[in-house]
Amino acid sequence: MSRFSSQVLVIAACVAGAVASACSSTPPAVPPTGEIAAPPAQPSENAAIEGVYREFWSVSWVSSAEPDQGWVQRLRAVATAELSEQVATRARQQRSQGVRLYGTVTPQITGTRIEGDRAVVTDCQDGSQAGLADAATGKPRNVGPSRNAVSATLSRQSGGWRVAKIEYPGGEC
């Protein structure tokens, strides 16, 4: 895990094997006779999941003044209540330490896997135009990596898909 990743969001525990299985080229198992397999994901469902994931980064990467209630509401539209609270808490902690985010991170989605009401998005995110900055001066303290491996778990809830967990598995992407 890069130092940048751990400073930006300390979010979640591991989803063991999620990234490895997302990158597997093994075809899905055929259900035994008499069992009904879930229908394959529709392109529109993949697009919806990927759209929520991209919006999560747009909303959660708050670089302005102290996040307001409107920001928290926008965050809850794309993230679970638990993750929204973790992100908001981390943003407040950074502010109290004289740090803020700057720039933008650019998702480069490399895969989406849907399993019922759960989806895993793998990303080789470009953070080279973003990082942590001094809150008073705006002077960057660091810059993110151009190829940052990210694994996001989304859950289907009433109202649509929400990002539930963000992980930084490390390694090349």
Per-region residue spans from a language model:
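Surface-exposed, charged secondary-structure patches
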Residues: 96-136
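C-terminal motif of bacterial Sec signal peptides marking the signal peptidase cleavage site
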Residues: 19-22
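Bacterial signal peptide processing site
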Residues: 24-27
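Extreme N-terminal export signal peptides that direct proteins to the secretory pathway
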Residues: 17, 31-35
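Bacterial N-terminal signal peptides that target proteins for export
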Residues: 1-12
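Core segments of small alpha/beta cavity-forming domains
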Residues: 35-100
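Short beta-strand edge/turn micro-motifs at domain boundaries
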Residues: 120, 140-173
